[in-house]
């Protein structure tokens, strides 16, 4: 088991319109990110879990030694890159990257993501869009066929070495690690 789990929880949640970031909102007596953290710990699938926060000194709760807390960056891509660089020293085989404000994933999903990494360099959970989607280019609006549209979710799973090479090469150009792997066979 050389799997690592990164939880990105340092964002400001600008779209959430609250006085505190979404990942720190209370849901079922815990902060949102803690649900993800507990699921990762309880799965026993990960050698280490990296919690990326804005300021680690603000976290009052102590976690198991398996949990490493690091400070994030200005943008999601900065935080992700910091976490990827941080775990490089442990020589991980696989890494799963998760959004700290999204607590609703199952242990079965974690198992399937890791299992599917045996035959892929990236495994991204998606759901097919049920909504109509419009796309605008230069004041022209187009309809996209929702049968061809998928919404990406987290956690997203990657072969660490492949992710590291692409993340370093692209640095802060992406909003989501899955983007690094699109059409890269």
Question: Which residues fall in each region the model found?
Answer:
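N-terminal glycine-rich phosphate-binding loop and ensuing alpha1 helix
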Residues: 2-53
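Short amphipathic alpha-helical segments
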Residues: 18-21, 38, 45, 62-64, ...
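Hydrophobic residues at beta-strand termini and immediately following loops
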Residues: 27, 70, 152
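Short, well-ordered coil/turn elements that cap or connect secondary structure elements
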Residues: 27, 44, 63-65, 117-119, ...
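Conserved N-terminal catalytic core of the sugar/cofactor nucleotidyltransferase
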Residues: 32-92, 170-173
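Short aromatic/hydrophobic "clamp" motif used to bind/position activated sugar donors
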Residues: 95-96
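Conserved core of the sugar-phosphate nucleotidyltransferase
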Residues: 105-185
């Amino acid at each position: 088991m050389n799997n690592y789990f990164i939880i990105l929880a340092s964002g400001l949640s600008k779209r959430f319109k609250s006085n505190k970031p979404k990942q720190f909102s209370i849901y079922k007596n815990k902060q949102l990110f803690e649900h993800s953290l507990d699921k990762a710990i309880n799965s026993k699938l990960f050698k280490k879990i990296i919690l990326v926060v804005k300021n680690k000194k603000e976290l009052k709760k102590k976690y198991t030694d398996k949990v490493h807390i690091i400070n994030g960056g200005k943008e999601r891509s900065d935080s992700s890159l910091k976490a990827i660089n941080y775990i490089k020293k442990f020589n991980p085989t696989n890494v799963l990257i998760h959004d700290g404000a999204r607590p609703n994933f199952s242990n079965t999903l974690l198992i399937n993501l890791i299992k599917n990494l045996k035959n892929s360099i990236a495994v991204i959970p998606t759901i097919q869009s049920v909504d109509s989607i419009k796309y605008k280019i230069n004041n022209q609006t187009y309809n996209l066929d929702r049968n061809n549209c998928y919404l990406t979710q987290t956690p997203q799973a990657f072969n660490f070495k492949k992710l590291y090479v692409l993340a370093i090469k692209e640095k802060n150009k992406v909003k989501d690690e899955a983007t690094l792997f699109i059409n890269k066979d």
